[in-house]
Amino acid sequence: MKTIIAIFSLAAMIVLVRPTPLENDEWTRSIINVPCKKCYKKDSNGVCRKIFGCQEKRNIIDPPCRKCYKKDSNNKCVRIAGCGNEAVKRAIINPQGCARCHKPDPNGKCRKIHGCS
């Protein structure tokens, strides 16, 4: 019986010794002054809570197109006509979009120029 009373009194002392947070202490002020991230706002206790219905839009950076591809008007990567192994090896593409030693035909396809090397 004496051990139960001793444990109870020890637990009571621990609870009483624990300091209570004050509104003016430095730690509490630092938490209250920290701004919430987008789509969150502080409640009356200083805790950041999500705003209902708010959607976070992430800034997604478009990766560049691979070799033999270029961006079209819709910002999509489309294959450059006639670009093949030769253009990939030399990485030389003329303004019409065809590889070196190629020219566009009336149908828009790139054709090899005879005798060009």
UniProtKB/Swiss-Prot annotation:
Q: What are the UniProt keywords, alphabetically? A: Disulfide bond, Nematocyst, Neurotoxin, Repeat, Secreted, Signal, Toxin
* Tissue specificity note: Expressed outside of acontia.
What is the name of the protein in this document? Structural toxin peptide sea anemone type 9a
Q: Which domain of life is it from?
A: Eukaryota
Keyword Cytoplasm attributed:
no
Compartments, record wording: Secreted; Nematocyst
The transmembrane residues are: none
Where would I find the sequence repeats?
28-56, 57-88, 89-117
Where is the major localization of this protein?
Answer: secreted
Q: Which residues form the signal peptide?
A: 1-23
Post-translation: what modifications? Contains 6 disulfide bonds.
What is the role of this chain?
Putative neurotoxin.
| Region 3 X approximate tandem repeats: start-end pairs | 29-117
